Each structure stands twice: as C-alpha cells, then as structure tokens.
A protein has these predicted regions:
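Feature marking well-ordered beta-strand scaffolds used for ligand recognition
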Residues: 1-188
Length: 188
C-alpha cells in the first residue's frame, strides 16, 4: 500500500476529530465524505496531487457521525440528541454541495449507525434501539418512514437484498431479519 495523497481539513494531529468516512463517485470523479465531531466535509480525491474540499457544513456536535449516499444525496446521522437525518445534495459537485435539510422521523431523535440498500436507509440504534427503515423511492430529498424492527438493540447491520444481518451487541447475539415487507419486518 502506498500513500498517494492526504488532506486534513481540521489541521489536527492523528485525526482525533474525525469519526467516519464514506465514498461517492459521479461523472468520472471520486469524493470522500468525511465526518468530523462538529462537521461534514465533501472532498474531491480524483487527483491525488490536488485533493480539495468542495464543501463543508457544521453539524450536530457528536464524537460519532456516520453517512451513506443514494442517487446524488448524502445522509448523515449522529448520536447527538435531535440530530435526525441531515440531507445534502451532491448534484453540483465538484463546484458545490447544498444542504437540503434535516429529516426527523416521528418520535426519532438520534441514530448510532446507518446502512443503505437500494432506495432504502436503515437507521440503527439510537432512539428506536432497533432498525427504522426510510424509503427514498419517491423523493430522495424527502424520506418516507416505513417499518420498525426493535426486538433487540441493533448497533449496526448489513443488508443483502431483503435480508438484514443485525448486530445485537447488548444481547450478545446476531439477528437475521426478513425485510422484504419494509412495513412489517420479521425475524428469521
């Protein structure tokens, strides 16, 4: 492995103020989506000799942020109270990024981790403890709440087709969940 370039937007030593990283590609360009404890950065990494921040936004203060992308949108969650799901429009990269807004599912305040599979987001842990599904089919900028599975606390999950593999760390187990019906997920 060879380091071909680096950028540290905060100028800190050892990256102590960063919490997660995700990738996004569009129009032949590659981007890093970097979460900081009070910020999110959209970084063009296409040319390792010219790595640059295309956009950054202040976010809810938390040591933990996680993000995923779908279509030309990025979705950011955190464990900060009342952080919901922050939505960013990436359509104008590399020129700019737009903040769409914050979506708060009914009764939802915070999320530990997020997964994406097809036009669905899976919110783990946090307010609901289990998994809350958001549907992006109609309008990715305006998620629609679907089902909730909360038999056990879910720290993180992996979604393969319509099957969820959920880490139930507080219970020392893993759950396998049928998510074919997003409104009524069932344990297999």
């Amino acid at each position: 492995i060879q380091l071909v370039g680096k950028l540290n937007p905060l100028g800190t030593v050892s990256g102590t103020n960063y919490s997660a990283l995700w990738g996004y590609s569009a129009n032949g360009r590659d981007y890093a989506v970097l979460g900081g404890n009070q910020s999110i950065y959209f970084i063009d990494v296409t040319d390792s000799t010219n790595i640059r921040v295309c956009g950054s936004f202040t976010t809810h203060s938390s040591n933990w942020h996680e993000m995923k992308t779908y279509s030309h949108y990025a979705y950011l969650v955190s464990e900060a109270d009342n952080s919901g799901v922050q939505i960013f429009d990436l359509a104008n990269l590399p020129v700019s990024v737009s903040y769409v807004g914050q979506y708060n599912p009914p009764g939802h305040s915070r999320t530990h981790s997020i997964q994406q599979s097809g036009p669905y987001l899976y919110l783990n842990g946090g307010t609901f403890n289990g998994i809350k599904v958001l549907d992006l089919t109609v309008n990715p900028a305006a998620p629609v709440p679907r089902g909730l599975w909360n038999n056990f606390y879910v720290h993180d999950c992996s979604v393969v087709n319509d099957t969820i593999w959920a880490a139930n760390i507080d219970d020392g187990k893993m759950s396998v969940i049928n998510a074919q019906n997003k409104d009524n997920m069932t344990t297999i």
